[in-house]
Amino acid sequence: MANLKEIRDRIVSVKNTRKITEAMRLVAAAKVRRAQDQVLKSRPFADKLARVLENIQSRVQFEAVDSPLLSKREVKSISLVCITADRGLCGGYNTNIIKKVEIRYAELIKQGYEPNLILVGKKAIGYFQNRKDKYVIKSTFKELEQVPTAIDSEGITNEVLAEFLSENSDRVEIIYTKFITLVSCAPVVQTLLPLDPQGIAQENDEIFRLTTKNSKLLVEKSNLEKNESDRLPSDIVFEQSPDQLLDSLLPLYLQNQILRALQESAASELACRMTAMNNASDNAKELASTLNLTYNKARQAAITQEILEVVGGSAV
């Protein structure tokens, strides 16, 4: 059995670690709220843009419009945009998304396609750059804001557009972590390009709100409802041709989709970090309790031994 000083030092160390993990949990909770606020602030523009595209879709047939972002061609090369975090200590967040990318990459190779990677986040960059013999990396992005903004999504959008319009990639998919609840998030695969005309309208869109109840953090979700007043008048006349309108609006729509994926990923990362730090705090509390019990037993045994030695010495 370890001596009393070693056990006492271990107890102090565990308690200090618990203070750190608890502080990190609270910081992550505050940042989740910031991520929530950012989503809500960007929502009006995203909603209005989707409504405008939906109305244009109802006025013209997208299939008859010559827009490069809507054109489908024979698929040979596919770009995968992978979004991970720059830091760890967030449970299985990074591991799960990297596994999803590996599985999807292997599937595409098996199907005869030529996949390549556009990596976002230091964790993905570090992992796949150490395996360059197995994966083709097109570009990397790191050190984005913890609460993503349009500036963060702009660079990724430009790279995605350049790959697709130059026909270096015939399809672009994004793999990110969808925010579900504070204790649940899942990696998902979504096609970015070519854009699907039938998928312009944001159906079943959700807004999440982080609230507190009985000193516990909860997530409230509500579906985004369409506002009939947003519909354009049927007699409105567009000065620009449908091609010009779509060439201006579709890149904005694409950037908004990427921004949303970044925001969902950021919220998922912070939620996973909250959960991981909460579990670490609970484990530290349990370990400290066990060590206290061990310390008390060791101290009792030492005292008993000293008493026996004193009694034995008196008898002699």
UniProtKB/Swiss-Prot annotation:
Assigned keywords, A-Z: ATP synthesis, CF(1), Hydrogen ion transport, Ion transport, Membrane, Thylakoid, Transport
Protein's membrane topology: Peripheral membrane protein
Keyword Transferase on entry: no
Domain of life, per lineage: Bacteria
Alphabetized InterPro entries for the sequence: ATP_synth_F1_ATPase_gsu, ATP_synth_F1_gsu
One GO molecular-function entry: proton-transporting ATP synthase activity, rotational mechanism
Location within or outside the cell: Cellular thylakoid membrane
Pfam families: ATP-synt
GO annotations of cellular component type: plasma membrane-derived thylakoid membrane; proton-transporting ATP synthase complex
Family note: Belongs to the ATPase gamma chain family.
Entry function: Produces ATP from ADP in the presence of a proton gradient across the membrane. The gamma chain is believed to be important in regulating ATPase activity and the flow of protons through the CF(0) complex.
Subunit structure: F-type ATPases have 2 components, CF(1) - the catalytic core - and CF(0) - the membrane proton channel. CF(1) has five subunits: alpha(3), beta(3), gamma(1), delta(1), epsilon(1). CF(0) has three main subunits: a, b and c.
HAMAP family: ATP_synth_gamma_bact
Protein name, UniProt field: ATP synthase gamma chain
Organism annotation: Prochlorococcus marinus (strain MIT 9515)
UniProt lineage: Bacteria, Bacillati, Cyanobacteriota, Cyanophyceae, Synechococcales
Designated gene of the protein: atpG
